[in-house]
Regions:
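Conserved anion-binding
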Residues: 35, 39-119, 123-128, 135, ...
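Glycine-rich phosphate-binding active-site loops on the catalytic face of alpha/beta enzymes
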Residues: 54-65, 145, 154-158, 162-183
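Short glycine-rich, acidic/polar surface loops and turns
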Residues: 126-130, 151-160
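Catalytic-site microenvironment of enzymes
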Residues: 50, 71, 182, 186-193
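Glycine-rich beta-strand-to-loop/alpha-helix junction loops that act as flexible
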Residues: 5-7, 141, 171-174
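Conserved, mostly hydrophobic/aromatic
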Residues: 3, 32, 55, 112, ...
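Acidic (Asp/Glu)-rich catalytic clusters
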Residues: 16-24, 46-49, 68-74, 131-132, ...
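Conserved alpha/beta-domain cores
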Residues: 1-20, 31, 37-40, 124, ...
Length: 193
């Protein structure tokens, strides 16, 4: 179990201070860095003092950017983010991509492998194809217990994700929205069926 913090938390009034006080915890900084190589490197240098265990970067930043980021990351595991789980083929076409989402994810997984990234983030729906070209950790967001998918599109249940080969599951709102204790029990019940 680890703690995942996004840009909104890190940039909040007390976010950085809170993260700096966490000791002996797995810290996953989900910043989804997406910029030119120099800015990606500068961003990683700017948060080195937080000693995060995992840090995300968009593979769409390009090979030079992710390779430079990996070089400067040190002990921090650099995680390549593929296509966001809130996007499907229609949404990708709207922003100028003509390839199928699975083809894009597969191409990005190959690039992550070439840059020697430590892990990759992709939808649980793509894990099986990603495993063919990327042999390290695979982290899957968009995990849902039921049909309430919020703004996620490419979703699966925890059991389906593990069956497909996911190493780590990111489960946010299904746990944090509403009664957390009850939601955790729902997760436990789901996994024990």
């Amino acid at each position: 179990v680890g703690y995942k913090f996004g840009l909104e938390f890190l940039n909040s009034k007390n976010g950085r201070n809170f993260i700096s006080k966490l000791k002996k915890k797995i810290i996953f900084a989900d910043l989804k860095i997406n910029d030119i190589p120099n800015t990606c490197v500068s961003t990683i240098k700017a948060i080195k003092d937080l000693k995060v265990n995992y840090l995300t970067i968009h593979i769409s930043s390009g090979f030079k950017a992710i390779k430079a980021a990996k070089k400067i990351a040190g002990k921090t595991k650099l995680i390549g983010v593929t296509v966001l789980t809130s996007l499907d083929n229609k949404a990708l076409k709207e922003i100028g991509f003509n390839k199928d989402v699975k083809k894009i994810v597969l191409d990005q997984a190959r690039l992550a492998n070439k840059a020697k990234l430590d892990a990759i983030v992709c939808s649980a729906q793509e894990v099986k194809i990603v495993k063919k070209v990327f042999k390290k950790e695979i982290i899957t967001p968009g995990i849902r217990f039921n049909s309430k998918i919020n703004d996620q599109i490419r979703t699966l249940t925890p059991k389906q994700a593990y069956k497909n080969g996911s190493d780590w599951l990111v489960i946010g709102r299904p746990i944090t929205k509403g009664n957390i204790k009850k939601n955790m029990q729902t997760l436990i019940d789901h996994l024990s069926q």
